[in-house]
């Protein structure tokens, strides 16, 4: 009977520590900035900056719907979707006789390199 209060105290302490860690987790940037425009130092020249979209977009995962799972060759329980930092609007420019696409606005959307 005297062991139950000891385990209860340890369990509550562990729960408090886990809750504290969980609250700190979303506030970290993990070394990756949000998706936004940044100047491209290679192609930019004074008076004519060239911008490109850079940064992180986070993926999401969710349980695979049963009807989708039935059509899979190798059924998977988890389905994931990746998003990339892509240009929402672009403007074509010429820098040193090289045609470039200057990004003017960015957002997180479908990764273009996955499309054919």
Curated annotation (Swiss-Prot):
Signal peptide span: 1-24
Glycosylation sites recorded in the entry for this protein: 77, 102
Record family assignment: Belongs to the glycoprotein hormones subunit alpha family.
Stored PROSITE patterns: GLYCO_HORMONE_ALPHA_1 (PS00779), GLYCO_HORMONE_ALPHA_2 (PS00780), GLYCO_HORMONE_ALPHA_3 (PS50277)
InterPro entries: Cystine-knot_cytokine (IPR029034), Glyco_hormone (IPR000476)
MF annotations from Gene Ontology: follicle-stimulating hormone activity; protein heterodimerization activity
Disulfide linkage: 32-56, 35-85, 53-106, 57-108, 84-111
Main location: secreted
UniProt entry keywords in alphabetical sequence: Disulfide bond, Glycoprotein, Hormone, Secreted, Signal
Species this chain originates from: Clarias gariepinus (North African catfish)
Reported function: Shared alpha chain of heterodimeric glycoprotein hormones. These hormones bind specific receptors on target cells that in turn activate downstream signaling pathways. Involved in gametogenesis and steroidogenesis.
GO CC entries: extracellular space; follicle-stimulating hormone complex
GO terms classed as biological process: G protein-coupled receptor signaling pathway; positive regulation of steroid biosynthetic process; regulation of signaling receptor activity; thyroid hormone generation
Highest taxon of source: Eukaryota
Alphabetized Pfam families for the sequence: Hormone_6
SUPFAM superfamilies cross-referenced by the UniProt entry: Cystine-knot cytokines (SSF57501)
Entry keyword annotation includes Glycoprotein: yes
Matching PANTHER family: GLYCOPROTEIN HORMONE ALPHA CHAIN, GLYCOPROTEIN HORMONES ALPHA CHAIN
Name assigned to this protein: Glycoprotein hormones alpha chain
Gene: cga
Subcellular locations according to the entry: Secreted
Record's subunit section: Heterodimer. Glycoprotein hormones are heterodimers composed of a common alpha chain described here and a unique beta chain which confers their biological specificity to the different hormones.
């Amino acid at each position: 009977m005297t062991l139950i209060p000891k385990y209860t105290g340890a369990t509550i302490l562990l729960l408090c520590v886990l809750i504290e860690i969980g609250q700190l987790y979303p506030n970290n940037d993990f070394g990756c900035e949000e998706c936004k425009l940044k100047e491209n130092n290679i192609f930019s020249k004074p008076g004519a900056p060239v911008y490109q979209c850079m940064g992180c977009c986070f993926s999401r995962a969710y349980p695979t719907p049963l009807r989708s799972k039935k059509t899979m060759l190798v059924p998977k329980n988890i389905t994931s979707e990746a998003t990339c930092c892509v240009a929402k609007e672009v403007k074509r420019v010429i820098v040193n006789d090289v045609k470039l696409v200057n990004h003017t606005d960015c957002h997180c959307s479908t990764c273009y390199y996955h499309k054919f």
